[in-house]
């Protein structure tokens, strides 16, 4: 058995300043840029995300014939709304090594190993709410704002806010208080067979994965003032089969030569989207809707 705790904390902050109109190109110093109104600009930002996880696993092995594993995770993500911050993800897997049964001894010279396996489990995902740099994209922050907006200089050259002497805050994205974990439920079964003292090994796997509350952006009308809106807006099914054959052609103390070949068949399909995905689910010039097969 095993239990554990994992804590992840990421904090990023940055500062930038820019200007133009410098008479010199050899010195990169804002002091040489133009002092005209609106030329020099400054900006700063900060961002933090935290993940707290509790997990455990219990394995059972009876005479290397009957195998059972139980796992459980509970994860909390700070950037999700408070009521949806935590997710629980269980899993179970089992295996039966037939080649260790007494009734298989008569064919052990040919069938050296045989195992049947199956598993079912849930996984949580929040990576869809982050961009390539690890920053949260639209729809998660209740207050995503831009700070010193509209800074300018008065007639005496003094820097002042542009809006009636006040520093305004501008909402950058619409909040989504219903955001929650993207969840995938996967069933998998298959077998592993070894022939002639495992000189030839055959592996077969079938899987069926059902993803719920999938992250995707919904395009909004231009008059709303926001171009898109991140939500848990659909269900997707992925299923397929994989077959692999391995031949251990040469096995000596100093040399090993192995040849493997594999093939796979996969089918992905959209199960559901709000309003059937039409007309507000154009994503990267690719229209998605209920029943459509994905490449």
Task: List each language-model region with its residue ranges.
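Extracellular/periplasmic, surface-exposed regions of secreted and cell-surface proteins
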Residues: 1-293
